[in-house]
Swiss-Prot record:
Name of the encoding gene: C2
Protein name per the record: Repressor protein C2
Taxonomic superkingdom: Viruses
GO molecular function: DNA binding
Record function comment: This protein allows the phage to reside inactively in the chromosome of its host bacterium. This lysogenic state is maintained by binding of regulatory protein C2 to the OR and OL operators, preventing transcription of proteins necessary for lytic development.
Source organism per UniProt: Enterobacteria phage P21
Swiss-Prot/TrEMBL keywords: DNA-binding, Repressor, Transcription, Transcription regulation
Amino acid sequence: MNTQL
């Protein structure tokens, strides 16, 4: 899982 803000 990759997350970016």
